[in-house]
Curated annotation (Swiss-Prot):
Pfam families reported in the protein's UniProt record: DUF456
GO cellular component: plasma membrane
Keywords associated with the record: Cell membrane, Membrane, Transmembrane, Transmembrane helix
Taxonomic placement: Bacteria, Bacillati, Bacillota, Bacilli, Bacillales
Subcellular location: Cell membrane
UniProt name for this protein: Uncharacterized protein YqgC
Membrane spanning stretches: 5-25, 28-48, 49-69, 89-109, 137-157
Membrane-related topology note: Multi-pass membrane protein
InterPro entries: DUF456
Length: 160
């Protein structure tokens, strides 16, 4: 039965990793759900206040990494707040409009459209900013993936 429980916990963690590229899936919620699931299926006794504090810090860093990577990607390539908002909206809408490819194209198209509409930038500049948005998004995915691995690694270190 323990093996089945661990598979269930692993499945919840896998869903969290899917949330790296599909922003409608709240990664942190699924990671914490894995911790709580372990507590219900096995025991909450391994969890100390320090465990929850460390995991909360990881979660805060994860949220910050997402925001900062997008911000730096757009700003580095000359984008404005409008491009950041466009990128975020594109990230949320893109996967639904263009399944799979929308994950990558959404932030790019959103940033480009925002710069073209709000600041009347020329197409070349808007594309450059869109590229910055894409680089920021991909950097954020990598950073968040590493942080999620650290969260799960600390969980495993605590309970095993």
């Amino acid at each position: 039965m323990d093996m089945l429980y661990w598979l269930l916990i692993a499945a919840v963690f896998i869903i969290a990793f899917i949330g790296l590229v599909y922003p409608v899936i709240p990664s942190v919620v699924f990671i914490v759900a894995g911790f709580v699931l372990y507590g219900f299926l096995f025991s909450f006794s391994p969890y100390s206040y320090m465990f929850w504090l460390v995991e909360a810090v990881f979660a805060a860093v994860l949220f910050a990494a997402d925001y900062v990577s997008n911000l730096l990607g757009v700003k580095r390539f000359g984008g404005s707040k409008a491009a950041i908002w466009g990128s975020t909206i594109g990230l949320l809408i893109g996967p639904f409009v263009i399944p799979v490819a929308g994950i990558i194209l959404g932030p790019f198209i959103g940033a480009v459209c925002a710069e073209l509409i709000v600041h009347q930038k020329d197409l070349k500049s808007a594309f450059k900013i869109g590229l910055g948005s894409l680089i920021g998004f991909l950097t954020g995915v990598i950073a968040k993936g590493i942080i999620q691995l650290l969260m799960i690694g600390y969980f495993l270190w605590t309970v095993l």
